[in-house]
Amino acid sequence: MRTTYIAKPGEVERKWYVVDAKDVPMGRLASAVASILRGKNKPTFTPHVDTGDYVIVINAAQVKLTGKKASQKMYYRHSNYPGGLKQRTAGDFLAKEPEKLLETAIKGMLPHNSLGHKQGLKLHVYAGEDHKHAAQNPEVLDITNLI
């Protein structure tokens, strides 16, 4: 009898990838990175097992916002106090916290459950070129052929 392969958590081999976000549209980058974090690029992908790889995103401050998103796209948060609604544009968000902007976009494309949270922990975003994961020997991934 033939059965579908189901990955087991102990059998998963993980790689480390470095992705350069310079001049790449934010949504397309986020979609490709989320797919790698989930493991959908592997033939052993199993929906209920974390089969994804680690991803390091560098140059987050130079990611491209297309159209008028820098001035018109709004991000909201609330302090749970009356009148505590805070809002800012994507351009302000990119100028002040580029790492958090990209993390928000990528994690929004992961499952919203405990498995998605575990997959999100394998994401590391840096505003500049430097990162502290050289010991893992990350492989440079050209994202332009994935988008």
Swiss-Prot record:
Keyword Lyase: no
Lineage start: Bacteria, Bacillati, Bacillota, Bacilli, Lactobacillales
Source taxon at top rank: Bacteria
Family stated for the protein in its record: Belongs to the universal ribosomal protein uL13 family.
Phosphoprotein found in the keyword field: no
Source organism of the structure: Limosilactobacillus reuteri (strain DSM 20016)
Gene3D superfamilies: Ribosomal protein L13 (3.90.1180.10)
UniProt-listed InterPro entries: Ribosomal_uL13 (IPR005822), Ribosomal_uL13_bac-type (IPR005823), Ribosomal_uL13_CS (IPR023563), Ribosomal_uL13_sf (IPR036899)
PROSITE patterns: RIBOSOMAL_L13
GO CC aspect terms: cytosolic large ribosomal subunit
A GO BP annotation: translation
Protein name in UniProt: Large ribosomal subunit protein uL13
Binding partners and assembly: Part of the 50S ribosomal subunit.
Physiological role: This protein is one of the early assembly proteins of the 50S ribosomal subunit, although it is not seen to bind rRNA by itself. It is important during the early stages of 50S assembly.
Gene: rplM
Keyword terms of this UniProt record: Ribonucleoprotein, Ribosomal protein
A GO term for molecular function: mRNA binding
